[in-house]
Regions:
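An N-terminal, well-structured beta->alpha segment
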Residues: 1-73, 79-80, 168-192
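Bulky hydrophobic/aromatic "packing anchor" residues in well-ordered structure
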Residues: 7-9, 95, 140
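Gly/Ser/Thr-enriched, mixed-charge loops and adjacent short helices
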Residues: 12, 120-192
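Ferredoxin-reductase
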Residues: 46, 50-132
Length: 192
């Protein structure tokens, strides 16, 4: 079993409370993305990578359910002792850029790209900024299934906020500077 599709985990956002076992079933059987499922994904990523002094970069787009999903993913990483950098509402390339700039261990972009607005999803990136491999996603799924068998008190996830330092201003400027520098590198390829 693999809860990941071709580009991460995606489903219709469902903010109603449910247990972790029900969260897995809701995604697999009904394509519903719940807060406990987002938490399981964050915990699974933290446990699978198991890095010392680990850090994760989290960005999201402006879909209605995303602040609550961000809170769930953030909570999972904080519970695992990870440093969390919240980028705020941003484009996926900013997650890649900040991931590489900060030398974080992982990145998560909360979006469903071209899917309907009521959907969202989790795209996972490794320390090199690459999309997770199918083999790694199977490992994450197994860890999520194991975690779902444990009892977790996740009622505190109900809500729609993302706490913490949102570094979007600091990182958007750095990303813009990086893009300008790249364009200057390519300027010789184009005639005036």
């Amino acid at each position: 079993m693999n809860v990941f599709g071709t580009d991460g985990i995606r489903g219709e956002v469902d903010l109603r409370p449910c247990g972790t076992r029900q969260a897995i079933d809701a995604l697999v059987d009904e394509r519903r993305l719940t807060l406990p499922l987002a938490w399981l994904a964050g915990q699974a990523l933290a446990r699978t990578l198991d890095a010392e002094d680990a850090g994760v970069v989290i960005g999201w787009d402006d879909r209605p359910g995303n602040p609550a999903l961000v809170h769930a993913v953030q909570d999972a990483f904080l519970a695992a002792g990870w440093n969390v950098t919240l980028l705020g509402t941003c484009a996926t390339p900013l997650v890649h850029h900040v991931l590489l700039e900060t030398k974080a261990n992982a990145g998560v972009m909360i979006t469903a790209s071209h899917n309907p607005v009521e959907d969202s999803g989790l795209k996972v990136f490794d320390a090199s900024g690459r999309k997770s491999t199918p083999e790694f996603e199977v490992r994450l799924t197994r860890t999520m299934l194991d975690l779902a068998q444990e009892d977790h008190d996740l009622l505190h996830l109900v809500g729609d906020r993302a706490d913490g330092d949102h570094g979007e201003d600091r990182f958007e400027d750095a990303h813009a500077d990086w893009l300008h520098a790249r364009m200057e590198d390519l300027s010789g390829m184009f005639p005036d």
